[in-house]
């Protein structure tokens, strides 16, 4: 059994994205029906993760609400964050996780989330190098953005209920924008 050096863990919750270039950082999240897209530029050594609740679309009126819940918004934020840190779009690669159907009697929003992520990445010309989506159980995900390594654990029983609860928590309220403009 190989022991891993302890790295700095950064948790990505629903409605967030993180971009890092530190090889000692591992990004982690817990997914039920939500999806996390993990992207990186293997040459520049920068990578990141997002965590979205609903697919959304640029033409959907629902997306005009709390944008941080929607994949269309968080995918753009993640890509732009990577580019700002020196990644090149033509070198980006992605892995997709989550999208479980955790509650049988509800519509399969997890499947819709995963399908959205696949189509978005295809439309953007970003290569998908790994995917683990669907199923009936949540996942705990760890992603090392600099190397692209990912590890997941299936959540069953109590862990699955915790993942469902995590997915149903509201996203954090957006921070107010600071401005030096005074309106009167």
From Swiss-Prot:
Quote one Gene Ontology molecular function term: protein-glutamine glutaminase activity
- Pfam families, sorted: CheD (PF03975)
UniProt keyword annotations, A-Z = Chemotaxis, Hydrolase
Instruction: Extract the ranges annotated as region (Disordered).
Output: 165-184
Q: What does this protein do?
A: Probably deamidates glutamine residues to glutamate on methyl-accepting chemotaxis receptors (MCPs), playing an important role in chemotaxis.
List the HAMAP family: CheD (MF_01440)
> By what name is this protein known?
Probable chemoreceptor glutamine deamidase CheD
